[in-house]
Every structure is written in C-alpha cells, then in structure tokens.
C-alpha cells in the first residue's frame, strides 16, 4: 500500500505506516513505556530506548481485543449464549436483547449489518453495568483486562514501567 501512495503522490522517499507508531510518539515522545490504544479498536506498543514493539491493531474482523467493538460483539455473543442456556442472563443481556427485538434472529440480523462502531456503542453501557455489579458485564470487562495484561506481558512490560 505504501508504494501505491508514494506512486500516486509522485514522491521518491516516502514511508507510509499505520497510526500505531505516531500514537507512541504522541504518548511517550522519546521516553520508554507502554501505550495501550483502546477505543473502537485496540493495539499495544512498548518503546524501549527508541525501539518500538507492536502488538495487535489488526482490525475488527481479526483482532481489536478488549476494544469497544470487541466488548459489544462479545455482549451479543453472551446474549445468544444465555438464550441457548450455556451462560447466565443478566439485566444487561436481557435489556439489550429486548432493545434489539427480543429474539436471537434479531441479534443475528443486527450483527450481520453492524460496523465496529455499531458494536462499540454498547461499550459505555457494559462499563456502567459492570460498575453496578452486572455479572455478564463484569465478565466481559475482566476478559478484556486479562487480554491487555497478557499482551503487555508479551511485549515485555512489567509493573513500575510507564504505562
């Protein structure tokens, strides 16, 4: 893709990168530390002595674990699991199921046409419900936090290092 951009612009010396490295520069400057970019999508980056290691940022279909979109998708999965009897329903799962039409088919229809931001719109409600003790929401938040810790550890981060 970088070559296509350089060719289209008529430039000889061009480096085209995704936004993860610029996020590291913006967050850390030249300092060492870990950046967790968690919004609609997600990535982690660790900078040590000017060298940057990257993890994630592969987009909604293949990654973005612990992101708002991931939380929303997993909430809908949790609703379907509750309907199937393999997960416990909660106030949040019952409410969202009703809002989307009340049937598993309504969940599937919504998900089939949903963008990452459509899934992510559930994230603030998941956070709020977790803070109020909703078991399903807490499980989703804990799963996301566990992923972020595994990813940070995989990059070599340790407690006490800038985050």
Where are these predicted regions, by residue range?
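Phosphate-binding/catalytic loop of phosphoryl-transfer enzymes
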Residues: 1-89
